[in-house]
């Protein structure tokens, strides 16, 4: 929870392709360690008024902006896409492999939820927003045709990709920095949740549920636009710590008796981080968490509740409390989390790209000249920052260079 999942993926992609050129719609990251010292080429949106704080307001320009990057000099294009990065233009002799965190959620299956949360369910502004999202959907569906290989960050997202683009995707789980999270066998008597305080994370649901369980203590780490609402819901048994540095978060992840999760996420990094510390997870049983938490079998690492409601969560907490001591082995939680290590991501992603590129070269009747860093050896450089590096935001592209070949990586 030092960076978002997209920044972690970008860092590991650059570790696999350490000479990559990076392209991004905008470039406002304060923490630049994920760039590994690489400079960033940005779109015209970077120079528009208020782009730093209001870049999402330029959504209608995103498709146009991503198509302005001239990547014709590269043989290999990689994109890490939440929205439009997979829409970079490329030719028949280039390989474009896209790591898709999700199809554009606010334009597809979650459109109505996003409009309701934004207060755009009715009225003239609603009509304008729906027209824009219709345009984004059409562009998004067309742009997927320019991708040769699709990777998804979970089976849940792979199903969404299949529904949206009618394409199959290889599942490559995102990297979690389990090496910097330590196992702790003994637990204290409190529950933990940690997240940005935004509507879809449903921290309000968790806090409200604990307000009905005054004998059970909850600690909340994180801040965001819903801070005021959540503070109003919190009873005396709920402690709101706001944003905290990694050391404080790590300490609480280690000591909590369970990590509580209420969001429907594409994957969900924080439940894996909790398990890496030996802490079981109590989660809403929908989305990527169903793949990262084991609720059945000989070595469970958590339990699920079926409905995104206070009553369902309270019932799940009651079930957890009624379980015998030792029902969740901290070492089993840790072992499960290690399935999502950065090293395993690098291995799977490098193999995915290398095999795809070799197949294209065979089709073209050429031998591959691309030099790809083996994932098992792809370690971050000693100094992640260098002069001239630039920050990245939500949409970017990168390309590594070889003496005889060029590669490109695009990120959204």
Language-model segments: residues:
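Short hydrophobic beta-strand element within catalytic cores of glycosyltransferases
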Residues: 280-285, 290-293
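A charged, aromatic-enriched C-terminal amphipathic alpha-helix characteristic of glycosyltransferases
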Residues: 324-362, 370-374
